[in-house]
UniProtKB/Swiss-Prot annotation:
Belongs to the protein kinase superfamily. CMGC Ser/Thr protein kinase family. CDC2/CDKX subfamily. The active site is at D201. Its main location: nucleus. Its EC number is 2.7.11.22, 2.7.11.23. ATP binds at L62, G63, Q64, G65, T66, F67, G68, E69, V70, K85. The keyword Transferase applies. Residues 56-372 form the Protein kinase domain. It is an enzyme of class 2 (transferase). This is Serine/threonine-protein kinase BUR1. GO terms for biological process: positive regulation of transcription elongation by RNA polymerase II; transcription elongation by RNA polymerase II. One of its GO terms (cellular component) is nucleus. Serine/threonine-protein kinase involved in transcription regulation. Phosphorylates the UBC2/RAD6 ubiquitin-conjugating enzyme (E2), leading to monoubiquitination of histone H2B and the silencing of telomeric-associated genes. Also required for histone H3 methylation. Necessary for the recovery from pheromone-induced growth arrest in the cell cycle G1 phase. The gene is BUR1. Keywords: ATP-binding, Kinase, Nucleotide-binding, Nucleus, Serine/threonine-protein kinase, Transferase.
Length: 753
């Protein structure tokens, strides 16, 4: 049998196929990794990526990335423009760059409107293999045989980046535009930091802008994850950990001071420093900290923000480059940017460019800075001229500016009307865009004779209403468009929009409105409360409420608030404790009992009874005495008489005998003796006897059941008013088995529940 089984196993293995040749295990010299070199096939295919040929086409180079070039391309199937980031693999044995692997992995894990999106990856076959497919002859294919392999990261095409926008002379940014851009940058970097990543290359060239005015943070070639807690309103991400990273990151002009001093235990605050540099670059249109070397970069930083003291930055003395902190520079950022920013703007700039990374603002705290809530408020949507502005266009902008300066017409004589109007327009624009740094010069009372030419007097606008056009003017206007016709001002303007009403709904900072609050409508039930469509609880389709399992009235509260298992639906849906087998494997052995834990309102002196309050029964009003025919009361208790022992000697023997008989009756009774100090003496023939009157009927039938029980009721198990089973009942739990109990067809179904 064993030989037959082994033969079957060998036959089965042969049918699957045997490995004829095992490739040798090789070892990479640089990385020390072991790998297997597989033989190439003619139909080579890289799985997980798209083939470049036949799907995409390069058009124009846009810029240079960290480890590759960026091109503008076209997706041939949809004719949509895309940005193609080329990742170069130089030789056949070269590994895929680790920075590109990080960038692809991080972009796949990010999804935010202010972070660039990775569409797909594309693999370009080397032209040496597919020269004919590229439309090349053999000579062209052999000439380009040594070209490098390349992967492409396909990204959405952006019309501009921030460096091109700032250097474009035809684009002017207002303060509302700058605030909008800053908020978008802070939202994007806050999302990246909360996802436990550091960008480590924040600069204007890596902040892109699409045609809708949405900024997107790009170029994650130097990004990586960090260790520690994510940022909050006070501390940056990764604070308080011993993790060490490389300090040679970030472009030099945007490098934080802790990186300049050689700190390897940095946090997400290095990205906030770059955002502060970008914020200041909005106003000077050029990088604000242009150091020539790494040491010079530290001097440039301290010249702007001042040399840090021990109180400003306590840990600076322990960094490798602490010699730079021995300089003595005073901060000059207020003199440099005070002409552009208000006090709140300067405060935001100084906290973004704080030398101590732990005193630097986090992104979520910077978004709540009061600079963004003062006038002018940030624009809701960014609208810029539709012109492509990339980093590669900066040189072209400089050439255009030189050409325009050299080709300017000769200047007009001083005091000319055209020059005067142009200077007035420029001054008005300047005063609208920037706050006054000094008062404008006062106008002289006597005008200069050259300022008012005689040939072209200035016409003042007339205050008369516009006249009706003549027939000649109407005939002229009907022939064609009148180029220099001015539209008269409208006689009636549209009404101004009403301001938002005060209150917390429209203005959160408004004082509270101390008005009486209207109480909520009492829920009277479905047949009393209605909406516009009919039933209060449903929509217009009808009585769906009456067929649902549970409606809006559920879950309701427990009446006495003492049942821990009460779930609001009138039944105990789960008598056992829920547990997660994957997380707590031992919970199945730690089940709590089904018996509920009684609350504070439960009185356990008698079982299965709930007491509302501890009070004696109140008598019925005379008009509400229950009808004995409808509500038969139990048999009245016999009157119990007690002997007054102080007066036995002064009575007759008959009275003594009667009292003795009554005393024996009392002694044989099973009920406790109750004396009443307020009982009146009975002056009958039998002597002075204290008569015990029965208690008055109680008002609440439920309390009558609880307090007014006799011996028969209290002797039943559980203290129930009615016994669960009697010999006469059909279920006969406490009696001998009968035909009804043995026959399952005659058994009451209620007994099982």
């Amino acid at each position: 049998m064993s030989q037959e089984g082994s033969a079957k196993r060998a036959d089965f293995k042969y049918k699957i196929g045997k490995i004829k040749h095992t490739p040798p295990v090789l070892k990479d010299v640089r990385s020390g990794l072991e790998f297997i070199e597989l033989e190439k096939r003619d139909d080579e295919k890289v799985y997980g990526v798209t083939k470049f040929l036949g799907n995409y086409k390069e058009e124009k180079k846009l810029g240079q990335g960290t480890f590759g070039e960026v091109y503008r391309g076209v997706h041939l199937a949809t004719q949509r423009q895309v940005a193609m980031k080329k990742i170069l693999v130089k030789t056949e044995n070269d590994l895929f760059p680790i920075t590109a692997q990080r960038e692809i992995t991080i972009l796949k894990r990010l999804n935010h409107r202010n972070v660039v999106q990775l569409i797909e990856m594309v693999y370009d076959y080397p032209p040496a293999q597919n020269g004919a497919a590229y439309g090349q002859d053999s000579s062209q294919a052999s000439a380009s045989a040594d070209t490098m392999k390349s992967f492409y990261m396909i990204l959405p095409y952006m019309v501009a980046d921030l460096s091109g926008i700032l250097h474009n002379p035809r684009v002017t940014l207002e303060m509302a535009d700058i605030k909008n851009m800053m908020l978008q940058i802070l939202e994007g970097i806050n999302y990246i930091h909360c996802k436990k990543f550091m960008h480590r290359d924040i600069k204007t060239a890596n902040i892109l802008l699409d045609h809708k005015g949405i900024l997107k943070i790009a170029d994650f070639g130097l990004a990586r994850n960090y260790y520690g807690a994510p940022p909050n309103l006070k501390y940056p991400g990764g604070a308080g950990t011993d993790a060490k990273y490389t300090s040679v990151v970030v472009t030099r002009w945007y490098r934080a001071p802790e990186l300049v001093l050689g700190d390897k235990n940095y946090t997400t605050a290095v990205d906030i420093w770059g955002i502060g540099c970008v914020f200041a670059e909005f106003f000077e249109k050029r990088p604000i900290l242009q150091g020539k070397t790494d040491i010079d970069q530290g001097h440039v930083i301290f010249k702007l923000m001042g040399t840090p003291s021990d109180s400003d930055w306590q840990l600076a003395r322990y960094l490798p480059g602490a010699e730079l902190t021995r300089t003595s520079y005073e901060p000059t950022y207020k003199e440099r940017f005070g002409k552009y920013l208000t006090e709140k703007g300067l405060d935001l700039l100084s906290t973004l460019l704080s030398l101590d990374p732990y005193k630097r603002l986090t992104a979520m705290a910077a978004m709540q800075h009061p600079f963004f809530s003062e006038d002018p408020l940030p624009k809701l949507q960014l609208t810029l001229p539709c012109e492509e502005s990339h980093e590669t266009d900066i040189a072209r902008y400089g050439q255009e500016m030189q050409k325009t300066v050299s080709n300017l017409p000769p200047a007009a004589p001083s005091g000319h009307a055209v020059e005067q109007s142009q200077t007035q327009q420029q001054s008005s624009r300047h005063h609208q865009s920037q706050p006054y740094q000094s008062l404008p010069p006062q106008k002289s009372s006597q005008p200069h004779p050259q300022q008012i030419p005689e040939a072209a007097p200035v016409q003042q606008p007339s205050q008369q209403p516009p006249q009706e056009p003549s027939a000649h003017q109407q005939q002229y206007s009907s022939r064609g468009p009148q180029q220099h016709r001015t539209t008269p001002a409208p006689t009636s303007l549209p009404p101004k929009p009403k301001p938002a009403p005060p209150g917390a709904r429209y203005n959160r900072e408004a004082p509270p409105q101390n008005k009486p609050v209207k109480p909520l409508t009492r829920h009277l039930g479905a047949q009393y409360q209605h909406n516009n469509y009919g039933n209060y609880y449903n929509h217009w389709q009808g009585g769906e409420r009456y067929y649902e399992t549970y409606n809006d009235g559920y879950p309701h509260a427990d009446r006495y608030s003492d049942d821990t298992h009460y779930n609001g639906y009138g039944y105990r849906s789960r008598g056992y404790q829920r547990y997660d087998m994957r997380r707590e494997g031992e919970s199945r052995y730690n089940q709590r009992p089904y018996a509920p834990q009684q609350g504070a309102a439960y009185r356990p002196n008698r079982r299965d009874t709930y007491k509302l309050v501890d009070r004696t029964g109140q008598p019925y009003p005379p008009e509400r005495v229950p009808n004995p025919e409808l509500h038969p009361s139990p048999a009245p208790r016999p009157k119990r008489t007690l002997t007054n022992t102080t007066q036995l000697s002064s009575h007759s023997s008959a009275a003594t005998g009667s009292t003795a008989a009554s005393g024996s009756a009392v002694s044989n009774s099973s009920e406790p003796v109750r004396r009443s100090s307020t009982a009146s003496l009975d002056n009958s023939e039998s002597g002075n006897i204290l008569q015990q009157k029965p208690p008055p009927p109680v008002a609440n039938p439920l309390e009558a059941r609880i307090y007014g029980r006799d011996e028969v009721q209290s002797n039943h198990p559980g203290g129930r008013l009615y016994p669960r089973s009697t010999p006469d009942s059909k279920n006969s739990e406490g009696a001998a088995p009968s035909e009804a109990s043995t026959d399952p067809t005659k058994r009451n179904i209620v007994d099982y529940y």
